[in-house]
UniProtKB/Swiss-Prot annotation:
It comes from Verminephrobacter eiseniae (strain EF01-2). The chain crosses the membrane at residues 10-30, 47-67, 76-96, 121-141, 151-171. Coiled coil: none annotated. It is a multi-pass membrane protein. This is Inner membrane-spanning protein YciB. Keywords: Cell inner membrane, Cell membrane, Membrane, Transmembrane, Transmembrane helix. The keyword Zinc-finger does not apply.
């Protein structure tokens, strides 16, 4: 059920874009994301920080897109989101000497510190890559191509998360043997 909720806004955005254009699609994305968050809250009785940030950015950038009739705002939202995540992970690691991923997931996954550090670096690199690739697509491709990229670009996080799982798995198996 939750996986369907994750895809709801992007599928509705894509469909409405193909039928009605970027401004209707932006309004649909805003409404679908708000509905998605309401449903997640109804199921979990809480929203994670990432959900709140995503909703705030979609509503903010979407409102600017609609009010100013300028699609650049909604197209830059992923660049800002991923860039901010990359910077936040790096600053937490360097300035605060804390591993944000370990703080977030350490109670659920017992992993060696070196594994947490590598995961953190992988997330920093992944978020920086996603920010950069979205910026490239926004700057060099048409809005039609950007929308297609947004839909098919959902493969990137799936591949990344599968890779993370494959990296973590041997370390979890080793825990049971000690």
């Amino acid at each position: 059920m939750k996986i369907l909720l994750d895809f709801l806004p992007i599928v509705l955005f894509f469909g409405s874009y193909k039928l009605y254009g970027i401004y209707v699609a932006t309004a649909v994305l805003m409404a679908a994301t708000a509905l998605q968050m309401a449903l997640i809250y109804a199921i979990d009785r809480r929203l994670q920080t990432m959900h709140k940030v995503t909703l705030a950015l979609i509503l903010s950038f979407g409102a600017l897109t609609l009010a100013l009739q300028d699609d650049r705002f909604i197209k830059w939202k992923p660049t800002v989101l991923y860039g901010a995540m990359s910077v936040a992970l790096a600053l937490t690691l360097w300035a605060l000497k804390k591993n944000f991923l370990k703080l977030l997931l350490g109670s659920q996954l017992a992993l060696p510190d070196m594994v947490w550090l590598r995961l953190n670096w992988a997330w920093i690199a992944y978020c920086a890559f996603m920010s950069a690739i979205n910026a490239y697509v926004v700057l060099h491709w048409s809005t039609d191509a950007w929308v297609d990229f947004k839909l098919w670009g959902y493969v990137f996080p799936l591949v990344f998360l599968i890779g993370q799982g494959l990296y973590i798995a041997p370390h979890l198996k080793n825990q049971g043997r000690t």
